[in-house]
From Swiss-Prot:
Organism, scientific name: Salmonella choleraesuis (strain SC-B67)
GO molecular function: malate dehydrogenase (decarboxylating) (NAD+) activity; metal ion binding; NAD binding; oxaloacetate decarboxylase activity
Signal peptide boundaries: none
Gene assigned in the entry: maeA
CDD domains according to UniProt: NAD_bind_1_malic_enz
List of residues binding a divalent metal cation: E246, D247, D270
Full protein name: NAD-dependent malic enzyme
Keyword Transmembrane: no
């Protein structure tokens, strides 16, 4: 039986003339048909030729190639996004591998630092502390009524760059761009938000161009009351929203997640998304080596909320593979700037306290140091996996990597800190120091390493493999919460798509060109698990798949028809 592609239904539009051309979600530019130009008062406002979206995308690609710096390319793409969103996503879809590092990490870091300097047009919602009592009115000002995904930041811990104030808005904008480009979530359903609670970045406070609230950051009870007002206003406006916390400081990230994950459908991508993609990568790497994650010893450099979130997800996975909780925790070693986390270390945060090693178990270690450094830990633990989430460059030294390789023939080394300027070690150095034997995955994109005439592909342990699929799965299933089991199902699905596992060679993670396929598969796994967990209404597998297909937006123009307001 011959299949036919179902034609998208026409959209009925009340806007016309220049107003329509200024509406990024609806603007087609030179692709408005002759009939649409006549019906929507556009005749004479556009050049004569009616173009297809592919013709527009080809021109945009040529213009893009004319820019020499990554930040200029970023600014150009953001301008298209703020002019014609459908064209923006078609262009990004056509050149995803080239453009993902430009619209998000690492280039978005520079865009956040220069936000007030390169600002051109409003996008998203800025809620400042002085406006805290007007939140309901502010959210009513959002023109898109059917918002389904919000990414919110307070700008305090932007990548590895620290406090960027309202410049942090670049992160929600970039993140939501990937929800659409990778996960097929319509841009009409997305909303970036920055909570402007001031900044402690003196450079910003002294900058005459800075556009945020010029005030030191509010903290403690005032801060949490402000965030709570925001959460309650969001629940009132969009009760079924998916809320993603993004780049909150360590002292606030885990408390906010703990407080709200059972009150509103929410997750923290820095903690849970990073953990899910890292665990998926490690499952795949372990299987490719003919073993399980539960058989590995793992050392972390960085014991903040992200590092501890990854560690807890690893522990949960190794328990699924058969370890007891105590045995699983004994395989994970957390090192921060004060050394190895132990049960005698004072002033640990609650989420760190669960990840300490008992000093009684360390008495046989070969060291004379009271503070156990990363080198001490690597020398005594003899780990199979080394993960960096420190945000500090160069901490995986040659001595440390060579010491690890001395005891592990095929070490897995994951310097995950963003942006590239903060990476713990470069893939080039790791490959050289391990004589080509390391499997390397990074947080930011790196080119393949060539060493002794052999090419070593470098996997990017990018959260974009995970969060777009989670978002699509939540929307398609109608899930009311995001459970740990849903995140673990996302990790398992990602591992199943590993070329290294499936083909015995290649990258440990799928190619970016296949990311929409991966996102769909993760969406199905997440939606199915949501149903099993009782946080979504149970349906057949066919109905869930159909819901995913129905919610997967494609960057294609639809026919417009005129209607009154």
């Amino acid at each position: 039986m011959e299949t036919t592609t179902k034609k998208a239904r026409s959209l009925y539009i009340p806007y016309a003339g220049p107003v329509l051309l200024e509406f990024p979600l609806l603007n087609k530019g030179s692709a408005f048909s002759v009939e649409e130009r006549r019906n929507f008062n556009l005749s004479g406002l556009l050049p004569e030729v009616v173009e297809s979206i592919e013709e527009q995308a080809e021109r945009a690609w040529l213009q893009y190639q004319g820019f020499k710096t990554e930040i200029d390319k970023h600014i150009y793409l953001r301008n298209i996004q703020d002019t014609n969103e459908t064209l923006f996503y078609r262009l990004v879809q056509n050149h995803l591998e080239e453009m993902m590092p430009v619209i998000y990490t690492p280039t978005v870091g520079a865009a956040c630092e220069r936000f007030s300097e390169i600002y051109r047009r409003a996008r998203g919602v800025f809620i400042s502390y002085p406006n805290r009592h007007n939140m309901d009115d502010i959210l009513q000002n959002v023109p898109n009524h059917n918002i389904k995904v919000i990414v919110v930041t307070d700008g305090e811990r932007i990548l590895g760059l620290g406090d960027q104030g309202i410049g942090g808005m670049g992160i929600p904008i970039g993140k939501l761009s990937l929800y659409t480009a990778c996960g097929g979530i319509s841009p009409a359903y997305t909303l970036p938000v920055v909570l402007d609670v001031g900044t402690n970045n003196q450079q910003l406070l002294n900058d005459p161009l800075y556009m945020g609230w010029r005030h030191p950051r509010i903290t403690d009870d005032e801060y949490y009351a402000f965030v709570d007002e925001f959460i309650q206003a969001v629940k009132q406006r969009w009760p079924d929203i998916l809320l993603q916390f993004e780049d909150f400081a360590q002292k606030n990230a885990m408390p906010l997640l703990t407080r709200y994950r059972d009150e509103i459908c929410s997750f923290n991508d820095d903690i849970q998304g990073t953990a899910a993609v890292t665990v998926g990568t490690l499952i795949a790497a372990s299987r490719a080596a003919g073993s399980q994650l539960s058989e590995q010893k793992i050392v972390f450099l960085g014991a903040g909320s992200a590092g501890c979130g990854i560690a807890e997800q690893i522990i949960a996975q190794t328990q699924r593979e058969g370890l007891s909780e105590d045995a699983a925790r004994q395989n994970v070693f957390m090192v921060d700037r004060f050394g190895l986390l132990t049960d005698r270390m004072p002033n640990l945060l609650p989420f760190q306290a669960k990840l300490v090693q008992k000093c009684d178990n360390l008495q046989h270690w070969d060291t004379e140091n009271d503070v156990l450094s990363l080198l001490d830990v690597v020398r005594n633990v003899k780990p199979d996996i080394l993960i960096g989430v420190s945000g500090q460059t160069g901490l995986f030294t040659e001595e440390i990597i060579r010491e690890m390789h001395k005891h592990c023939p095929r070490p897995i080394v994951m310097p995950l800190s963003n942006p590239t300027s903060r990476v713990e070690a470069t893939p080039q150095d790791i490959i050289v120091w391990t004589e080509g034997n390391a499997l390397v995955a990074t947080g930011s994109p790196f080119s393949p390493v060539i060493w002794k005439d052999k090419v070593y592909p470098i996997a990017q342990c990018n959260n974009a493999y995970i969060f777009p699929g989670i978002g699509l799965g939540v929307i398609a299933s109608g899930a009311s919460r995001i459970t740990d089991e849903m995140l673990m199902s996302a990790s398992e699905t990602l591992a199943k798509h590993s070329p290294l596992v499936n083909n015995g060679e290649g990258l440990v993670l799928p190619a970016l060109k296949d990311i929409q396929v991966v996102s769909r598969a993760i969406a199905f796994a997440v939606g199915k698990m949501a149903q099993q967990q009782g946080v979504a209404v149970k349906t057949s597998a066919e109905a869930l798949q159909q819901a995913i297909d129905d919610n997967f937006w494609k960057p294609e123009y639809r026919d417009y028809r005129r209607t009154s307001i």
